[in-house]
Amino acid sequence: MSEFHRLYFDELLFDFPDLVKVQKDSYASFVGGGDAVSSINDIFASVFPVNDGYGRASLEFVSCRMGEPKHDEYGCVERGITYSAPLRAILRLVVFGDETSGEGGEGVSTEPAVKDVREQEIYMGDIPIMSKNGTFIINGVERVVVSQMHRAPGVFFDNDKARSISGKLNYIARIIPYRGSWLDFEFDAKDVLYFRIDKKRKLPVTLLLRALGLSNKDIFAQFCEVSECRLTKDGKWTVCFVPERFKGVRLQYDLINAETGELVLAKGNRISIVLARNLYAKGLRYCYMDLEVMKDMYLADDLVSAKGEVLLPHGTRLTKEHVAKLEFLDVDSIKLVELKGNYIFSTVLQYDCSYEEAMLSIYRVIRPGEIPSIESAEKLFESLFFSPERYDLLNVGRIRLNAKFNLSHDESLTVLTKEDIFCTVRELALLQREVGDVDDIDHLGNSALGLRRVRSVGEFMDNQFRIGLVRMAKVIVENMATADFDTVMPCEMINSKILGAVIREFFMSSALSQFMDQTNPLSEITHKRRISALGPGGLNRGRAGFEVRDVHTTHYGRICATETPEGATIGLINSLAIYAKINKYGFIETPYRYVRDGRVTDEVTYLSAIDEIKANICQASVRVDEEGYILDDLVYCRRNYENVFIPRSEVQFADVSAKQIVSVAASLIPFLENDDANRALMGSNMQRQAVPLIVPEAPLVGTGMEGYVARGSGAVIVAKRAGIVQYIDARNIVVASESKDDFWIDSYTLCKFRKSNHNTCIHQRCVVYQGQRVKKGDILADGPAIQQGELALGRNLVVAFLSWRGYNFEDSVVISSNVVRDDLFTSVHLEGFECVVRDTRLGPEEITRDVSGVAEEFLHCLDEFGIACVGANVEAGDVLVGKVTPKSSSPVTPEEKLLRAIFGEKAIDVKDSSLYLPPGVSGCVVDVKVLQRRGIEKVGRALLIEKQAIDAEKARRDHELAVLTNYIYSLLKEMLVGKVALNTLAPISKGDLITGEALEKIDRESWWKLSVDEISSIKLLRQRFVDRFDEINKTYEENFEKIRGDDDLAQGVLMVVKVFVAVKHTLQPGDKMSGRHGNKGVISRIVPAEDMPYLADGTPVDIILNPLGVPSRMNVGQILETHLGWAAYNLGKKISKLLDEGNYSEVKSLILEIYKNDRKMMARLKRMTDTEIVEYSRSLRRGVPVAASVFEGPKTDEIERLLVLAGKDPSGQEVLYDGVTGEKFDRKVTVGCKYMLKLHHLVNDKIHARSIGSYSLITQQPLGGKSHFGGQRFGEMECWALQAYGATFALQEMLTIKSDDVVGRVNVYDSIVRGDNDFYYGVPESFNVMMNELRALCLNVEFCSDLERKEDFSDLPLAVSGR
């Protein structure tokens, strides 16, 4: 493969990660593999052991293992089955006897004795396996499990957004677990604090605090601000001055410093927080307290005299009498609590209760209608928040709680603690007092906590697996109740279908398990990197507001700000940014380079939104010298999500790349920074709709991301390790090691004409040659929409921005006939058709070529077995699979009786049920698959297909064995040459020196018979050869068995025949095209090349776009792309001309001039010889590829330099001539080279014409829609139009013979056949339908003409109105 190099205008400092690593790592955490540890064992351990409830037996988990899949990925797609592996677990049944195994301290039994132990390995179900590309194959269809962004477990604080009558916001707190009951706290308008469990009826928080075991004294200690007053020697009471407690207080007494005695502030003054802090800063620590102020305060602790007597209990409200007696009591200190602002204590005072009352009240709310006991209430309350079986915060929730409240609990503690609840209540009380801030749920991080996290496929599978095992455990308990433990085995208690059904339900019906978008490699990779806020446990798109959809500052480098759908889900479905990854807690991280002492280093670290808040981060474009030191004294940075200028010494991190804020699709748009955001969004989305073309072409103006996307998509074949290509053909590549010490063989199989989910063609082409050395990671074969290892979604066209005869009005596109003639935008689509052969009640259906009643012209593509031949050209209406179905016998006629009497057998009565090619489809049969039911002997075409598959496998095996044999014999030859022969083997005699020429005269298999000194090493080599030979043979024998194996088909199905037809779609008017900047349009006309506008040298343009489509859309990036593309295109023409002239010195100087600003390429060119430079220049004949990276593309002066170098006007405009008149246009026109895509909205899939077709059974009107081969509806408004013009006869035709007048239709047909113009109208069938509906209402309405006799109904006894 010739290497693909682009002209870069920036430097790539940080390589890209595996683009589907998110999916792979997440699923690996579930099933294990690589460095990941399987979580299946942990889930088993959390559910097992399962006890029968009576202490008779226990079923324990020992271990589990995953088996191997029955078929490979493609085999599952072919057969329409799930790519999965069996899960087997070793379970141990422990049966207990009546005896005890020991005694307690007083002779009480401790545990029953083990009577019997039985272990067994049990099949638990099939677990879907992720393919190497990060997808799942479910029922033969590739699916993707989209990652979901949801609220992270933990505590959230918010307000109700609506102010109360007093103008104050009421605050709420919510503790949300990953699994378990929600706990909400909220204030009402009267500042009373309530709590709810699972959004049930609210209760005063007193009940919760009492249930947690708190007394009033504990509540004072936990939630109240206690003021300790001390009695001085002169008989005055002093209190500690705390600025926060004096905030907003109007003094009721003179504020006097107790230490100095000076007056600080006079009575009546109001103290602000600023004033309070200033007083504290000036040394005010203690102040005198007036006894009158103590009135109405509460005792926080028992008032105890010096003798230890309790004078007043805690919680006592001080009255005038109490205050008056204080100076006479024998106390020197008192602890007081003020009711104002202490919402929790005020709630306790209003709604006080005992521990038992609290427990019973909570039980009644959780389980209304049940009669509670204190024991059951305690058990329920304990299980709600403190039981690991029913409550789980995950390590994320624990980390967030620890960070929010400065706790130090271990990550493994994933249940609530009392301290968590106390801290939440305390924080909420502070918020109600307007101290602190609420959380921003749209943050990916807020202060010291992250609020939104991502859960991927591994976590979903964890949850489903747990649900399945819990259900299975319930069934096990039920089975244990009736089991005979003397004989029962573990397998008899397990129903393996339960687990498989839960997992299958998730993959088949979950909103996050989606049919993979497989239009092109970019759509695949984008789908795998998608993050949805919808789905179970997520948002509802109908109720999601603007805030949650909007771009947030924390999305920087984590979620793409550009790529999102345009419809109702805008902002709810996003894509990961290029460099972003998800950490073990589910938070999205983005990489940054360390900056130390003003020097940007190459050391990279990943930061989440939590870690990033307090960091100073500069942009990737910051100016640095050669050693990485920042040049500017003040640097533009982000800190706490605000943009600030800071000294360079304070910079901590730098972005790794300017493009790290965009997604994969957006990073493929050159000059993205010059496009309006809405058009950039459209450009990102429309690239995913581009159809792979027959001859893909990489863009001349790319972004440098094309190669990374091609590799990451899995559409190309990449070398696993360095070696030499030993063999290639259209379907196989064999690479072997270059080293003879550690020999290996890698065999690669290419995909050929495989159908994708969206009917595009997956076809791989080999790009290496035999004998070529390849490195690890080199591309061996291109896939669909890939050229030379780079993504190639469209073609480079010469474009002119020009209004041309009205044909490009309103974004229409005019195309040259050259584009169609050269098949530049021709694509191949695969249509799959399936014929199912069933065993009916009257007998089995049969596949045959002998189909009665079908003309031979429709059977031309069938072989002798009745199945279409591969390579046959088929048209609409042709039979792809001939099939007949038995039908019930009709009464026997005398003629049939005579035939039976003569021939002695009954003629089988069958009907045609063949598979026909539907209307609007024509193409070539490229593949046929025949699947047969297990137990039925393979016949006909099935055997032929099986033989072809086995022959292909044998050929692949023979190639590998040939490579191995050549390698072994080359080693043997090296070992023999130069040695003395110890025996005779003609023409070598005993004692002769063995030479290479002599060995060539002997059959290679006979070389082993030669005896030399080092015979032991030769024997070891032969053993290695035999072992490796057997290993290869064994592998392929297993493949042969899989091919020969039967297929598991549905009940009653004998055979399934799948026929794949390749349909070629050429470009035609009505097809949709677009660029990469959101500039889309429909082809209005394909103009002959000679009529297209042409340049001064006679070159006609390929496509004409409307210049009015640029200013209003504000996607100026397409103009810059056009200019740069024009320079690249003409530089290629210039190089081609110099090569043809043989002027190699100018070629070299031109190449060096082009790449002079690309440091990496210049270093490479300096290492190349003149001959190598000329050879490289031959690959640039079609244009010099350039990379205009996002936010780091070439500036205007660089584009002008390249245009001048190419010999073009630096303005990018050219003189154009009209191809029709030959006249020059009035002014210069913008002409350039632009990358255009053909989208999958093809006119062939939308338009059709009906001549004859089916009718509706009831109304007898033609059906509607292309799938029913329907007609155009002449509706109500169209009738009005004909009425308005007075076209009565035309209207009558439309409503009768052209619609549902059955008799009239037949008459018209007869008239046409006879050549007459006379016909008459009948009654439309819809009129009869209306009449029958009236009769169904018991209204017998008859319509008569005026000429018919009218009956007299006057004598009938009818009720007359008004009598």
From Swiss-Prot:
Catalysed reactions listed for this entry: RNA(n) + a ribonucleoside 5'-triphosphate = RNA(n+1) + diphosphate
GO (cellular component) term, any one: DNA-directed RNA polymerase complex
PROSITE patterns, sorted: RNA_POL_BETA
InterPro entries: DNA-dir_RNA_pol_bsu_ext_1_sf, DNA-dir_RNA_pol_bsu_external_1, DNA-dir_RNA_pol_su2, DNA-dir_RNAP_su2_dom, DNA-dir_RNAP_su2_hyb_sf, RNA_pol_bsu_bac, RNA_pol_bsu_CS, RNA_pol_bsu_protrusion
GO-annotated biological processes: DNA-templated transcription
GO molecular function: DNA binding; DNA-directed RNA polymerase activity; ribonucleoside binding
Enzyme class at the top of the EC tree: transferase
Keywords, sorted A to Z: DNA-directed RNA polymerase, Nucleotidyltransferase, Transcription, Transferase
EC numbers: 2.7.7.6
Family: Belongs to the RNA polymerase beta chain family.
Subunit relationships: The RNAP catalytic core consists of 2 alpha, 1 beta, 1 beta' and 1 omega subunit. When a sigma factor is associated with the core the holoenzyme is formed, which can initiate transcription.
Summary of the function given for this chain in its UniProt record: DNA-dependent RNA polymerase catalyzes the transcription of DNA into RNA using the four ribonucleoside triphosphates as substrates.
Protein name: DNA-directed RNA polymerase subunit beta
Record organism: Neorickettsia risticii (Ehrlichia risticii)
